[in-house]
Curated annotation (Swiss-Prot):
The chain crosses the membrane at residues 5-25. Belongs to the 'GDXG' lipolytic enzyme family. It comes from Bos taurus (Bovine). Glycans are attached at residues 270, 287, 389. It is found in: Cell membrane; Microsome. It is a single-pass type II membrane protein. This is Neutral cholesterol ester hydrolase 1.
Amino acid sequence: MRSSCVLLTALLALAAYYIYIPLPSSVSDPWKLMLLDATFRSAQQVSNLIHFLGLSHHLLALNFIIVSFGKKSAWSSAQVKVTDTDFDGVEVRVFEGPPKPEEPLKRSIVYIHGGGWALASAKIRYYDELCTTMAEELNAVIVSIEYRLVPKVYFPEQIHDVVHATKYFLQPEVLHKYSVDPGRVGISGDSAGGNLAAALGQQFNQDTNLKNKLKVQALIYPVLQALDFNTPSYQQNMNTPILPRYVMVKYWVDYFNGNYDFVQAMIVNNHTSLDVDEASALRARLNWTSLLPTSITKNYKPVMQTTGNSRIVQEIPQLLDARSAPLIADQEVLQHLPKTYILTCEHDVLRDDGIMYAKRLESAGVEVTLDHFEDGFHGCMIFTSWPTNFSVGIRTRNSYIKWLDQNL
């Protein structure tokens, strides 16, 4: 009996040691976030072991775990019709909300899920529930795109998928089929999906052949640049779940099918050091000392290496491509973008990406709403139902949908 108690105590101590991580007191539901983070870390470690054993790529294994535990079939309710189909060869899940008697045509959002361009699915519970709620509360048609993921495809194939699916949807006959008003269509996405949505928005507003333009874009804690991994939010939140800095840098390397040997050099900005000529013209476009308010910059100092590793951008030139990093786009491109909503979270390495993009858009004359949550963390908006229901998840979702309701 005594040995059993000792063993149980030891196991509980080990579990507590594994689960506990120091978190800021201001973050929403800290113990619940620790449990969520521990679960995700466990899945990552299992997938890394599978990769080490040569059984599968670690990202395929990790996504298999995520999708297996969360996949949801296309189930319609009395209020929302849900169907799986494809648009120009790209899988989509369509959510058709209830019509308003006084409005024969509905508004619509094309939604792009997050997951570091490598994980998740439009068909997992979190995104299915989000899009169902959007369709019902907005009386809208939501098109959730099931774009292809790393490592099956790499940049720019993810962009191609969302462009093809969205262009197909914007055809007059397709909009008519779903009873959608051509003048009330927007694009949206979270995290890596926000990256793809921003890239698509820039591309569409330069496409003179498109008859139907996007009315709004709504970007949820978007990832927007890979030149500076030492912005104040990257420094402040380098170890904060569920997106530590080293994980975000690895997602970038994976997106470009790059070399993991570059990760540590990129973390300290060796890839954009002063001797890397390719990056010199772009630095002003993400100069956070001028783009961020002093309340954020505080005592943080820019990390600018005099000499670094020019081989990184030579082997991965996509790092400097505005299609992958919309924050570095030309000012002339930004000035034609539609009304924009950007949601940022305090406890997120990507916080400053969103704030800097909002500033650049405002400078270009775009109407922008920056919605910041002091207790938010990366990914929080999809965590709204038990057992992963967070107070800030519900508040961010409600704020996001309210903005869409007022502006779309």
